[in-house]
A protein has these predicted regions:
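Short His-centered aromatic/hydrophobic patch
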Residues: 78-84, 101
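N-terminal strand-loop element at the rim of the active site
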Residues: 3, 8-72, 82, 209
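Nucleotide-activated donor-binding/catalytic signature segment of Leloir-type glycosyltransferases, i.e.
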Residues: 212-230
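Conserved donor-binding/catalytic core segment of Leloir-type glycosyltransferases
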Residues: 128, 164-182, 188-195, 203-204
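A short, histidine- and acid-enriched strand-loop-helix "catalytic/donor-clamping" loop
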Residues: 95-112
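Short beta-strand->alpha-helix junction loop in the catalytic core
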Residues: 105, 134, 152-162, 210
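A short, active-site helix/loop in glycosyltransferases that binds the activated sugar's phosphate group
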Residues: 118, 122-149, 157-159
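Short donor-sugar binding/catalytic loops of nucleotide-sugar-dependent glycosyltransferases
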Residues: 12-14, 175-180, 194, 209, ...
Length: 232
């Protein structure tokens, strides 16, 4: 029996290099290692192609399509870049397409308006949302939609040891990019209000953002960057 060919397409900025891997790359790494098809999976990143300075996303996905257009691909996973869908659908019409949303769909090119989201619903085999909130945002103002191929799959962790509630500390963590797409502005707003109610709690942010626009008061949120590099 022929092995399945499964391609996972990372966003242009994401890398499989452990020194520069982002949230999407880490998610893909953590999930594929448990897949029974892991030997059939090929992960695509911009490192597979020559980089350009303009129209980077467009050239990245077009280069992928041109390179593999004569390859029989069974399943293609697109992560967090709905704008890639039209190209994939054109070049690989027989492939099953899954689209993963890691962020608010209304902030991503290719899913910002109602028509774009209707196109996604009609041209994918599965749509996977990494939180219920992300799913709710996708269906904002959409009516009479079929949810058969829609999955909400919240990101979880492996609980390695039990936690004694009597020993818990008053720390609340935010882990991720420090931007609005990740809800960091909401976290900071809540922290500022809650600290006035009970200043004994600590709000800690782990992450960074190259184009930072949110600057919380140091009295409300402590930003500590990244603690360590996750190795592949």
């Amino acid at each position: 029996m022929r092995k399945k060919k499964i391609f996972i397409i990372l966003p242009y900025k994401e890398s499989i290099d452990p020194n520069s891997a982002g949230a999407v790359s880490i998610y893909v790494k953590d999930t594929t290692k448990y897949s029974k098809y892991k030997k059939d999976i090929k992960i695509i990143s911009s490192e597979n192609f020559e980089k350009v300075k303009i129209f980077r996303n467009k050239n990245y996905i077009k280069n992928f399509c041109n390179k593999y257009k004569n390859t029989k691909i069974d399943i293609i996973e697109i992560h967090n870049r709905p704008e890639y869908l039209a190209y994939i659908k054109k070049y690989f019409p027989s492939a099953k397409i899954s689209l993963f949303f890691h962020n608010d769909p209304l902030t991503l090119r290719g899913s910002e308006n109602i028509d774009e989201r209707k196109y996604i619903l009609s041209n994918t085999n599965k749509i996977i949302f990494l939180s219920n909130w992300i799913q709710q945002m996708f269906f904002y103002r959409l009516k009479n939609v079929n949810l058969e191929n829609v999955i909400s799959l919240p990101v979880g962790i492996i609980k390695e040891k039990s936690i004694k509630l009597s020993q818990k500390k008053k720390n609340i963590l935010f882990v991720g990019k420090l931007n609005k797409a990740k809800g960091y502005h909401i976290f900071c707003n809540v922290a500022s209000k809650f600290k006035k109610y009970d200043p004994s709690w600590n709000f800690i942010a782990i992450g960074n953002e190259a184009r930072k626009e949110i600057f919380p008061s140091k009295n409300s949120v402590t930003e500590i960057g990244y603690l360590r590099i996750v190795r592949f």
